[in-house]
Amino acid sequence: TSGTYYAVGGVLKTVLDSKLTLSTLNVESTGASVANVNMITDGEAQMAILQSDVINYAHEGTNSFDGAPETNALWVAGIYNETVQILAKPGINTVSDLKGKTICVGDVGSGTEINAWQVLGAAGLTKDDVNAVNGSFQDGVDQLKDGKIDAAFTVAGAPTTAIVDYATTNTLNLVSLSDDELAAIQEAYPFLIRDDLAAGTYTGQDADVTCVAIQATLVASEELSEDVVYEFVKAMFDNKDALTEGHAKFGFLDPETASAGATVTMHPGAEKYYKEIGVL
């Protein structure tokens, strides 16, 4: 994901730099979402792109921020969804069906691993109920093809390349969340928003699949003024077409979804813009 975030940041700079009078943009490559929160806390960065769940953990002092909350990175906009997708052998239709199965839950300590256990836990499954193995999603796909595991989790924008490739030569089965599973997940983890993958997102997918997603989220330091952030957010939405030409992910940018996913404090500059256009 760091590759996509860096590319998205680069397009923001290219398109918006000339439009901004109150700030200039510089893009830095970093060590992913947790590092990005730390950089804002330390004053090394003023804005960052990161996963919406990570900003939640930072504000709550959970997971990677256990007992040490960091609250000065504020919500600006959810840019696009990163969907929690569960690729499984045929016959596994709900999360509950994963009981007793061997599942690749992502790399150790990854965001995917955290999201996988959130989804499994909300369905009532503990670490004793499944045989969890760690590895990248590509590892999981390969092991699924070889019959070594029963399912694999990934958290990525759909359509995801590894699933597209898998679907060309294998029977595609993506696990769809039941209404009860979805309700339990959203009650426990409000930052996991509903995301339905429309039929035809992948070859061989003939029905909609109900998933949850986190968002690739733009945050800003609370030390940035309201005026600076307001100007930035307005310029971003005003120049959506040019941004989308630069990177397809900006096609998903929408004021409703950009503001709706906010489960932490919103930056006053962003809030001013959303209220002005009537989505808040």
Regions found by a protein language model. Name each.
Residues 26, 46-51, 75, 85-87, ...:
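Structural recognition of the beta-strand scaffold that forms the well-ordered cores
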Residues 52-54, 62-64, 127-219, 224:
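Pocket-lining segment of extracytoplasmic ligand-binding domains
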Residues 1-19, 23-27, 81-146, 260, ...:
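Bilobed "Venus flytrap"/periplasmic-binding protein-like clamshell domains
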Residues 10-14, 26-67, 93, 138-143, ...:
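Pocket-flanking alpha-helical
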Residues 209-280:
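Segments of small-molecule ligand-sensing domains
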Residues 57-61, 71-78:
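Short beta-strand-centered segments that line the small-molecule binding cleft or hinge
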Residues 13-21, 41-45, 60, 91, ...:
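Sec-exported extracytoplasmic/periplasmic mature domains
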Residues 22, 32-35, 42-45, 70-71, ...:
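Extracytoplasmic
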